[in-house]
Amino acid sequence: MIASLTDWNQFLSQHPSAHLLQTGEWGELKSAFGWEPVRVISGDVGAQILFRKLPLGFTVGYIPKAMNSDQLSVSSEQFWNEINSICKQHRAIFLKLEPDLWNDQQLETWNLKLETSPHNIQPPRTIVIDIKGEDEQILAKMKQKTRYNIRLAEKKGVTVRAWDDIESFHRLMLVTGGRDGFRVHSLEYYKRAYELFHPKGMCEILVAEYEGKPLAALFVARNGNRAYYLYGASTDEERNRMP
């Protein structure tokens, strides 16, 4: 069935490992920038599909970070039939699926007629770090050079705090994107993301400063038992302070 936003959020509350990109808030963010979110629940499985309009009334469908292979398996035939029906209703010319899997071999258990896309939307690889424990325990798991740089930054007067200056964050992103050659979202995009996630305790912007001047910033988001490094930025100045 197609679920309302309220029903979808209630469904996700039973799945604490669900990816951030499957949350209702993420769907609402994308809806402000040209995508239509459709949430589908069939028994104990579900997915949020994003549709984007094309010329002549067609669309493309996209499921980012769908639930793991144990939930979306060949046994979920009714679920996939519903997905297929909804895609037809939206006149989707294709459905792009980027599942939340530990390895590509897990796709084989789905027994679906999938074709590998030559293009990724999300990064194809993700590093997962266990951050349980006290600060010293976490530091002890890092490489010696990393610990050195962290302590050097502290020694050189770099401080870190929560930040809500979205315009300054966007300016840092523009500097970083220009330097490293990647596309940066609009100011309105970051503002909307912050407005959707922050009041619910689902995101924070952290800024590293020296004498009140922003040197680097991180937009981190959280859902369930996982946090995500979404966007990071840094200035070209004071890099010797290891911000």
Where are these regions (language model features)?
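Short, basic, low-complexity termini and linkers enriched in Ser/Thr/Gly/Pro
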Residues: 44-45, 66-92, 104-119
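Divalent metal-dependent hydrolysis catalytic cores, especially in the metallo-beta-lactamase
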Residues: 91-99
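Glycine-rich acyl-CoA binding loop
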Residues: 76, 242-243
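A conserved beta-strand-loop-helix scaffold within acyl/acetyltransferase catalytic domains
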Residues: 2-57, 99-104, 111, 115-241
